Amino acid sequence: FSPKTGCIKSWNYRKSWNGKDEWFYPVIIDNMMNLELLYFASKVTGDPHYAEIANSHAITTAREQFREDYSNYHVVNYDPETGKVLHKQTCQGFSDNSAWARGQAWAIYGYTMAYRETKKPEFLEMAQRTAEFWLNHSNLPEDMVPYWDFNAGQEGYVPEWEYDANDFKEIPRDASAAAITASALLELYQYVDKKTGKRYYQAAVKTLKSLAS
């Protein structure tokens, strides 16, 4: 954790996926899942420092890692000396500006969990907004199991890796992203109004039925 960036570094120094940029302090959206351990550490030790780090990371991630529509960037690279954001990119998604499905799932679960642990309204808002992005996306299949990236193969999204649509008979799905999101929604529905909660619950059940079929 760095007080200058306000978040936890995910990897040591490395080159970006396309090899064009240097990542000095890369932070991935996946880190939202790991904050639960820090909240637990504060509970069992009585030391609030761990939870404070988790809160700082979640707040910084909400500010720097999300787009206006509440989709997120997989990787944000910071300058470790100044805390300034240098790059917003991907390492596993279709393109830098696309919505990698598992990354969206990490966010929904992560902010739902952060709200459970803190009851901070801004975390509940993030959980709902990221959930709404997922549930309302025009490219979410009827069975609720997403394509591996919501924007894979779409116009305006250019991958900087050797992608050839002919290699795939159809766009692959991401069952793990579906399971993560279903788990998050089964908790999130308890924290919102009854009407919204019912929609989240039904979406989770539909997702699980698809995964189990």
Q: What role is predicted for each listed range?
A:
Residues 1-213:
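Glycan-recognition and catalytic cores of secretory/periplasmic carbohydrate-active enzymes
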